[in-house]
UniProtKB/Swiss-Prot annotation:
Keywords annotated in UniProt: Clathrin- and caveolin-independent endocytosis of virus by host, Clathrin-mediated endocytosis of virus by host, Disulfide bond, Fusion of virus membrane with host endosomal membrane, Fusion of virus membrane with host membrane, Glycoprotein, Hemagglutinin, Host cell membrane, Host membrane, Host-virus interaction, Lipoprotein, Membrane, Palmitate, Signal, Transmembrane, Transmembrane helix, Viral attachment to host cell, Viral envelope protein, Viral penetration into host cytoplasm, Virion, Virus endocytosis by host, Virus entry into host cell
Official protein name in the record: Hemagglutinin
SS bonds (residue pairs): 21-477, 59-287, 71-83, 104-147, 291-315, 484-488
Gene: HA
Presence of keyword Lipoprotein: yes
GO biological process entries: clathrin-dependent endocytosis of virus by host cell; fusion of virus membrane with host endosome membrane; fusion of virus membrane with host plasma membrane; viral budding from plasma membrane; virion attachment to host cell
Functional summary from the UniProt entry: Binds to sialic acid-containing receptors on the cell surface, bringing about the attachment of the virus particle to the cell. This attachment induces virion internalization of about two third of the virus particles through clathrin-dependent endocytosis and about one third through a clathrin- and caveolin-independent pathway. Plays a major role in the determination of host range restriction and virulence. Class I viral fusion protein.
Residue intervals annotated with topology Cytoplasmic: 546-561
Family recorded in the similarity comment: Belongs to the influenza viruses hemagglutinin family.
Chain segments annotated as transmembrane: 525-545
Glycosylation sites: 29, 45, 252, 422, 494
Bilayer topology: Single-pass type I membrane protein
Length: 561
């Protein structure tokens, strides 16, 4: 009976130990993210990094934009009638519409895509006269019904159609030179007329063979008009092909011809560098945006988007992914409901997380004579948040650069070049998608490792405070060997705990409690001692009975040698 009472009393002493546990925030249903080491890591919080939402409008608030409407960018240089309002000007955003008109008289512009992109990337156009003069037998006022202006026949505003003043008269040999006296390069564009018939050619330029030469220090070419009927376009069977080049500062360009030249009247100076947009989206002057694409505007602070690989402005990088989740919380270990055993339902971070701890990432739960309690640790929480705050912004800084990729429409002669460019863009997209996945996975790994590290730092801080006044249970908790009321628990949490104040009480309780703690190591020892003691007592009883019987003559022992 004595032994039973002692064991019950000692177990009561063990049960009476005060206890403090460290834990971290957890949620019932976390978010799955990718890390370097795990394809499906559950975290408490995550944010999307890929923008999938488009504004179906061009947000132009605060921008000095020029909407070309039906005018093609090339038409701004040659003076197509529909482009009359756009021959000069400055802008920070140039908007090109589909089905815009480049030529009124049928024809084509050689290297049109390269020319178009130069215009779309510019921030303005100014014009300077070439100063060309012509003899009295030449008229520079050729017109056509294909280029109507104000209800009458007209021509390109920036070009002169040179023809013989007298029908059928041979066009005289003519030479004109333009010198660029500016400090910037000038863009000069001219045309070659290909008559639809010999009769048309003879009426305009005479019966002689036609030849045009254009020469500068960087450009030389000779052209021969090709006579022949073509399918009618805008009522015309003839064609005008346009050519262009850049005249460097201090350089001259010379035109020599005897008919068939569409001569430049003014040269263009492209200034600045700004945005060019191809889009059919409507303009909205009430919203702002820094990124545009064919479908409208992309207004986002996210580092990636999956709307289009062809965007202009300060845009997120295009990735071929629907979603890339960036971890903004710690590893999630949902709380396991504890049965109320010897130490109640309190458990530490090594077993599981704590749900319901909404005021911090890390915290404490304690149990003492006054009951149980929970409190967040703001210092470690803030340390973790400081490292995660701005993580999305840092990701944006690593990926967002002003990037312009104007969608191209290639002619037949440029088709192979177009294929190469499109293949290159697809390859870049694949590379960026891989880079984005790797970058997000690295950031997620860092976030989780950092959060785990802060948890361990907090645990180490408490362990160093308690020293020998408590014992670790291996599950994230400390069993305290002295009475620790709520004030004492608060001192442990805020790092003001005085170890020496409780040393004597803790030492005494440790000596009283440790001998009877039935941990796995001591349990076997106690069992062996108990077995040995029982055997000894049994042997003593048997021997006593033998001696008693021998003494009374009830038993005789004969020893034979």
């Amino acid at each position: 009976m004595y032994k039973v009472v002692v064991i019950i009393a000692l177990l009561g002493a063990v049960k009476g130990l005060d206890r403090i546990c460290l834990g971290h925030h957890a949620v019932a249903n976390g978010t799955i993210v990718k890390t370097l080491t795990n394809e499906q890591e559950e975290v408490t919080n995550a944010t999307e990094t890929v923008e999938s939402t488009n504004l179906n409008k061009l947000c132009m608030k605060g921008r000095s934009y020029k909407d070309l409407g039906n005018c093609h960018p090339v038409g701004m240089l040659i003076g197509t009638p529909v482009c009359d309002p756009h021959l000069t000007g400055t802008w920070d955003t140039l908007i090109e519409r589909e089905n815009a008109i480049a030529h009124c008289y049928p024809g084509a512009t050689i290297n049109e895509e390269a020319l178009r992109q130069k215009i779309m990337e510019s921030g303005g156009i100014s014009k300077m006269s070439t100063g060309f003069t012509y003899g009295s037998s030449i008229t520079s006022a050729g017109t056509t019904k294909a280029c109507m202006r104000n209800g009458g026949d007209s021509f390109y505003a920036e070009l002169k159609w040179l023809v013989s003043k007298t029908k059928g008269q041979n066009f005289p040999q003519t030479t004109n030179t333009y010198r660029n006296t500016d400090t910037a390069e000038h863009l000069i564009i001219w045309g070659i007329h290909h008559p639809s018939s010999t009769q048309e050619k003879n009426d305009l330029y005479g019966t002689q063979s036609l030849s045009i030469s254009v020469e500068s220090s960087t450009y030389q070419n000779n052209f021969v008009p090709v006579v022949g009927a073509r399918p009618q376009v805008n009522g015309q069977s003839g064609r005008i092909d346009f050519h262009w080049t850049l005249v460097q500062p201090g350089d001259n360009i010379t035109f020599s011809d005897n008919g068939g030249l569409i001569a430049p009247s003014r040269v263009s100076k492209l200034t600045g560098r700004d945005l060019g947009i191809q889009s059919e989206a409507l303009i909205d002057n009430s919203c702002e945006s820094k990124c545009f694409w064919r479908g409208g505007s992309i207004n986002t602070k996210l580092p990636f988007q999956n709307l289009s690989p062809r965007t202009v402005g300060q845009c997120p990088k295009y990735v071929n992914q629907r979603s890339l989740l960036l971890a903004t919380g710690m590893r999630n270990v949902p709380e396991v409901v504890q049965g109320r055993g010897l130490f109640g339902a309190i458990a530490g971070f090594i077993e599981n997380g704590w749900e319901g701890m909404v005021d911090g990432w890390y915290g404490f739960r304690h149990q003492n004579a006054q009951g149980t309690g929970q409190a967040a640790d703001y210092k470690s929480t803030q340390a973790a948040i400081d490292q995660i705050t701005g993580k999305l912004n840092r990701l944006i800084e690593k990926t967002n650069t002003e990037f312009e990729s104007i969608e191209s429409e290639f002619s037949e002669t440029e088709h192979q070049i177009g294929n190469v460019i499109n293949w290159t863009k697809d390859s870049i997209t694949d590379i960026w998608t891989y880079n984005a996945e790797l970058l997000v996975a690295m950031e997620n790994q860092h976030t989780i490792d950092m959060a785990d590290s802060e948890m361990l730092n907090l645990y180490e801080r408490v362990r160093k405070q308690l020293r020998q006044n408590a014992e670790e249970d291996g599950k994230g908790c400390f069993e305290i060997y002295h009475t620790c009321d709520d004030s004492c628990m608060e001192s442990i949490r805020n790092n003001t705990y005085d170890h020496s104040q409780y040393r004597e009480e803790a030492l005494l309780n440790r000596l009283n409690i440790n001998p009877v703690k039935l941990s796995s190591g001591y349990k076997d020892i106690i069992l062996w001692f108990s077995f040995g003691e029982s055997c000894f007592v049994l042997l003593a009883v048997v021997m006593g009975l033998v001696f008693f019987c021998l003494k009374n003559g009830n038993m005789r022992c004969t020893i034979c040698i």
